[in-house]
Amino acid sequence: SVGKDSVGCTDDPDPFVITLNNLSEGDSLAYTWTVTPQQGVSFAEGDTNSESPKLLFSEPGDYDVRLAVSNGCHHDDDSVFRIKAFAIPRVRIGDIADQCEPFHFIGRERVEVDQRNDKIQQVHWTITANQGYASEGYTLVNGTDLKSYYPDIDFKTCDYTVVAAYKNRCKTPGQAVFQVKVDKFIPVIPLPDDTICELAEARILRAQPEGGWWTLKDPAIPEAAEVLYTEWGNSYFYPGFDPYAQKDIGLVYHYRNGACIARDTMNMRIWPLPYVE
C-alpha cells in the first residue's frame, strides 16, 4: 500500500512534503519508487529505493506515484496514486493611463489569471484613491461587483490604486496591483456664430476655456494659412476672399486636458462688399 491521493500548495510557508506510506509486507523486499513527471519534485528524505521516502513538490502539476516491490522471487506493482500540487495564482493587469473619462474597464479584456493548477475560489478587488487628486468615483456595471472574476468598471476622472486578489486553496492569494489614471473632460463653452465684412481687419478669436487652438472646419479652402493664423499667442481670422461673394467659414476650437480633447464649432459669415458700377 502506498497511501492515497493528496493535494497541497507549493507556495505555502510550510513546504509541500508528502510521506509515502509504504505498508508492504514480506521478507527481503526491495522498493523502487517512480514519480511522473520528474520535474518539480525531489526527495526530501530517502531516495527511489527507500521504504517510505518523503517527496518535496516545488512546482504545480499532477504527479503520478508508483511503487514497484520485489523480493527476488516475485515482482509486484502497486496501483498508481496521484498527487496534485498547486501554487499561488498569478494575476497580470497592466497600469491604465492616458485615458479620458468616462473610461470603460472591461475585465475580460484586461485581466489575465494563471490559476496554477487549482480552481479560483475567491476574488476580491480593492480600489483606493491616491492622495493629491480629486477622484470622482467609479461604477460597477454589467451585473459585476468587486468579487467578480472579471469586473466591468466605469471610471470617472480619477487616480486610483487597485488591488485584485485571486485565491485558490493556497493560504496566500495571488495579487495584481495597478494604477488607474483617468483625465477629466472639460467641455468648451458653446461658441456663438459671428459675422465679419469681407477684407475687414483680422479678428482675434476667443473661446473658453483658454489655452486651446483653432482650426478650419475645411482645411482645403484657398489660402487657408492666411485666413486663420496665430501671432503672439493669439489666433486671428482674416476674411481675405472674393470681396463680392458671401461666404460661410466653419471654425473649430479644440481644448485639451491630458488625454481629453473637447471641441466646438462656430460659423463665421462673411458679408460681401457693396458692388458699384
Please tell me what each predicted stretch does.
Residues 24-32, 116-129, 209-216:
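Solvent-exposed loop segments of extracellular immunoglobulin-like
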Residues 31-55, 126-151, 215-240:
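Surface-exposed, flexible coil segments in extracellular/virion-facing regions
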Residues 13-24, 103-115, 200-209:
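A short beta-strand segment in extracellular, disulfide-stabilized domains
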Residues 67, 162-164, 251-253:
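Hydrophobic/tyrosine-rich beta-strand signature of extracellular beta-sandwich/beta-rich modules
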Residues 1-4, 88-95, 185-192, 273-277:
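Proline-enriched interdomain boundary motifs that mark the N-terminal boundary
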Residues 83-87, 180-184, 268-272:
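Interdomain boundary/hinge segments at the C-termini of tandem beta-sandwich modules
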Residues 47, 72-78, 168-175, 258-263:
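Short, exposed coil/turn segments at beta-strand boundaries within extracellular/luminal domains
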Residues 6, 28, 48, 78-79, ...:
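Coil residues (strongly favoring Ser/Thr
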